[in-house]
Amino acid sequence: MAALYRPGLRLNWHGLSPLGWPSCRSIQTLRVLSGDLGQLPTGIRDFVEHSARLCQPEGIHICDGTEAENTATLTLLEQQGLIRKLPKYNNCWLARTDPKDVARVESKTVIVTPSQRDTVPLPPGGARGQLGNWMSPADFQRAVDERFPGCMQGRTMYVLPFSMGPVGSPLSRIGVQLTDSAYVVASMRIMTRLGTPVLQALGDGDFVKCLHSVGQPLTGQGEPVSQWPCNPEKTLIGHVPDQREIISFGSGYGGNSLLGKKCFALRIASRLARDEGWLAEHMLILGITSPAGKKRYVAAAFPSACGKTNLAMMRPALPGWKVECVGDDIAWMRFDSEGRLRAINPENGFFGVAPGTSATTNPNAMATIQSNTIFTNVAETSDGGVYWEGIDQPLPPGVTVTSWLGKPWKPGDKEPCAHPNSRFCAPARQCPIMDPAWEAPEGVPIDAIIFGGRRPKGVPLVYEAFNWRHGVFVGSAMRSESTAAAEHKGKIIMHDPFAMRPFFGYNFGHYLEHWLSMEGRKGAQLPRIFHVNWFRRDEAGHFLWPGFGENARVLDWICRRLEGEDSARETPIGLVPKEGALDLSGLRAIDTTQLFSLPKDFWEQEVRDIRSYLTEQVNQDLPKEVLAELEALERRVHKM
């Protein structure tokens, strides 16, 4: 059968005979259900025709992105039993997936390059690497050959031209996704700019090729159409950065099937960024305006479950301060002609974790998801609404709950009503505090970059890096508390450098070199780098810092540091606020001594753990500048 990818060859989309494709099925026998293949740019038409020969769909639908098309897509999904209307809200829908298809599958997510070391550093002694999964071109070819021939039989192949970033922005990039999932079509219309305007902007330009199949062909054997289509045993998400291709099979869940998100916007884009001299990062972007009217833009990288969306949509507790959201998950950043680092949010929507979202933790998110939203794997209330752990809303009398598994549920039940990774997919424009410049084609100027993690002990509320090189080291050493899969293991501290550990598109050592190289750019105005930790606890296990809207007090100090205020003192790990420099007015008593303490025994162990991780996981690819920063920290901690 014809294969999408051939090892060692750039795929020839402009005529298949040189690669010796067997004839599968003439494209003329396929029904084009919507759109005109002949009007597509040559590169896209070749991509569609070859993929159709390979996957053998029943018909082809070229998406135009219109409201009428979206309505028809949602109606089709409802008729197939894949989504349910939520009458409590305006144009909101609920999808329930197969319980085996609920999250990103890191173990089945691979980067394909000729050399393993292009993708991942090689730990000493053949130890298992934790910084990505490499697959050889030959193995990947076999995997594609086993999965894709005929995989769309009985289904429609949708052609989705989409722009990551505002259409026409010099910072944006275009992709074309082929998929047999109408759920993906409806979700991608929210998460990206999708349709005819993208084709017009692309012309004959380059685009990232994205092929996705749920991996469950309908061969006329009486398969139930209401069952969530997926193929968990054969799930594979492959990235071929040299060819700018993404190939995903077997999963309908967001991170595996909405290929514009982590696959394109981080894994492929981080490689594009390295090749072209920019940055593609797992970061929120927010604008913050002081009471005096001074506005700054900040990018921040946090691992999962550390409040990235909450910070991006924060309602500041400090009077007179205003936060506006540019993006909550991904930042593409490039230096302009004047040396300013400018950032866009390449996404068009929010794909947020539902549990824990409430009017208390994130009122702006709750306002965003009242209309035009697709919910996945949350619970449903009998009055046509949604429900999840931490929604902080009492159930009205007589209202019952159906869990994400379709079973009756009541408060106090042992099992959660919503899956822990359940999601809302909502248009960004509906957020009440979207920044006026969130779609500015030139991007917004970044003044500070913040790293952070969930650290119950030892790490202070906020500190500033000494300089850019030290800041890159701080990002490389990021760690965060995570709940282990096995319950009895309790909480463990995981390394998550730059909050990018699952998303690197190339060797992390080379990624560090790329970040370090920014310092050598002529005229570059480098942002200051900070580290925050909202999650430190006292001996009794209580949080030392109230978090949420009170985090504006930390942003206030960061902004004053950017203005050159002398409000920091030097410590072995970085610059922390001087006594009284944080505005704590109106707060209950905060134990700042404990909040900013640096226990020597903790930091001695911390630097041992960081050294072990970097020397083992990055090994020979660890830049000498990062190793020098580690050694300098070791010396400073030794003198504490």
Curated annotation (Swiss-Prot):
**Which reactions fall under this protein's catalytic activity?**
oxaloacetate + GTP = phosphoenolpyruvate + GDP + CO2
Q: Name one Pfam family in it.
A: PEPCK_GTP
Q: Which residues carry this modification: Phosphothreonine?
A: 42, 196
Q: In which tissues is it expressed?
A: Widely expressed.
InterPro entries noted in UniProt: PEP_carboxykin_GTP_CS (IPR018091), PEP_carboxykinase_C (IPR013035), PEP_carboxykinase_GTP (IPR008209), PEP_carboxykinase_GTP_C (IPR035077), PEP_carboxykinase_GTP_N (IPR035078), PEP_carboxykinase_N (IPR008210)
What keyword terms does UniProt attach to this protein?
Acetylation, Decarboxylase, Disease variant, Gluconeogenesis, GTP-binding, Lyase, Manganese, Metal-binding, Mitochondrion, Nucleotide-binding, Phosphoprotein, Transit peptide
What residues bear N6-succinyllysine in this entry? 457
CDD domains hit by this protein: PEPCK_GTP
Binding-site residues for GDP, renumbered to this chain = 305-310, 355, 454, 534, 543, 548, 551
What do we know about how this protein assembles, alone or with others? Monomer.
Disease / disorder: Mitochondrial phosphoenolpyruvate carboxykinase deficiency: Metabolic disorder resulting from impaired gluconeogenesis. It is a rare disease with less than 10 cases reported in the literature. Clinical characteristics include hypotonia, hepatomegaly, failure to thrive, lactic acidosis and hypoglycemia. Autopsy reveals fatty infiltration of both the liver and kidneys. The disorder is transmitted as an autosomal recessive trait.
The remark listed among the other comments is: In eukaryotes there are two isozymes: a cytoplasmic one and a mitochondrial one.
Q: What does this protein do?
A: Mitochondrial phosphoenolpyruvate carboxykinase that catalyzes the conversion of oxaloacetate (OAA) to phosphoenolpyruvate (PEP), the rate-limiting step in the metabolic pathway that produces glucose from lactate and other precursors derived from the citric acid cycle. Can play an active role in glyceroneogenesis and gluconeogenesis.
Descriptive protein name: Phosphoenolpyruvate carboxykinase [GTP], mitochondrial
Tell me the lineage of the source organism. Answer: Eukaryota, Metazoa, Chordata, Craniata, Vertebrata
Report the gene name. Answer: PCK2
